[in-house]
Swiss-Prot record:
Name by which UniProt lists this protein: Involucrin
Modifications made to the protein after synthesis: Substrate of transglutaminase. Specific glutamines or lysines are cross-linked to keratins, desmoplakin and to inter involucrin molecules.
Pfam families associated with the record: Involucrin2, Involucrin_N
Subunit structure: Directly or indirectly cross-linked to cornifelin (CNFN).
Gene name linked to the record: IVL
Main location class: cytoplasm
UniProt tissue specificity: Keratinocytes of epidermis and other stratified squamous epithelia.
Species whose genome carries this gene: Otolemur crassicaudatus
Family annotation (PROSITE patterns): INVOLUCRIN
Subcellular location: Cytoplasm
TM segment ranges: none
Composition bias, Basic and acidic residues: 56-65, 80-134, 179-208, 268-308, 315-336
Amino acid sequence: MSQQHTLPVTLPPALRQELLGTLSPPAAAQQEQRKQPTPLPTACQKVGSELPGEVPSKHEEKGTDPVKGVLEQECGQQEPELHLGKQQDVHLMKRQDPQEPELHLGKQPEPEGPEPHLGKEQQHQESQDPELHLGKQQQQESQEQELYPGKQQEPQDPELHLGKQQQQESQEQGLCLIKQREPQESQEQRLHLGKEQESQEQRLHLGEEQASQEQRLHLGEEQASQEQRLHLGEEQASPEQRLQLLPQGPQEQELHLGKQQQQQESQQHQEQHEEHQKAEDLGQQHRQEKAQREQQLEEQLDEGKKLLDQQLDQEAVKRHEQLQRDEQFGMKKEQLLEPPGQQKGQLEKPVFVPVPGQVQDIQPAQTAKGEALLLPEQPQEPEV
């Protein structure tokens, strides 16, 4: 913890002791100052009592604590002499030691052992004496500015620093709010769209329910009107029925009975006519079905006859072709059986006419060329 809160300016031990000797007054003077502290404003006293034992390193390095800046202004206005005197001492020390920034810029020595102890003593002194703490802080800031000439000097005005810090914070907050608002807006839009869709669906559902209710009401009204009409018809028919049921004279009763008989006869006649019509319709249907069946049978028979005729014609043609083939085959056979010389001799041999008184040699008759020999009878197929 002590190393984290040490001062950022690191100097050799000899220079550090000289600076401490010049900056810190003697112990007796410090004790006198502690015994008789200068009166401070209420704000400085409150903040001095509330200052912690260990000051954060960030505020020590940058010197941008807003509360300290305000206190520095108030305390600096009330005690300008002390502040100016200390600044002059620092400037004199820097003029006497011109080699310090070169050494510091060239190589920063590593912190030695007594540094944590010195840091704790300084923190203890700063916590006890707020005036010394503020003055030392200002001196350290001026030393840092002179020792690090390349470093950008931070604004010493606490109001400007606070303004910039507030601007940065406001910008960061604005960016964070914008980033947070974008998903929130998208979610809100989605929710709004979902609500609109739900409302539209509810409206449609309500419209459908209203339409169904209207249809039901309309149907109910129609049914009621029909029932009313039937009721009126019954009411209109009821006087006639009442007249019929009332006690009447003999003539009226006979007329009434005659009318009833006529009605019954007409009903019976109508029923008989309907039955007769139904029977005629059934008979006509049977006739039509029978005619259709007969027609189908005739068509089937005609088709069968045609097929048989075709088959018989085909068989007759085949037989005729077979006979022609057989005849041709027999002629070829005869031609092959007769030798060629005999056929020529038969053609050249003269015919002798017998003379009366001469004995004629009986020779078997030979068939002339081209005549067909009688083949053994073959069974003939019956012609169709």
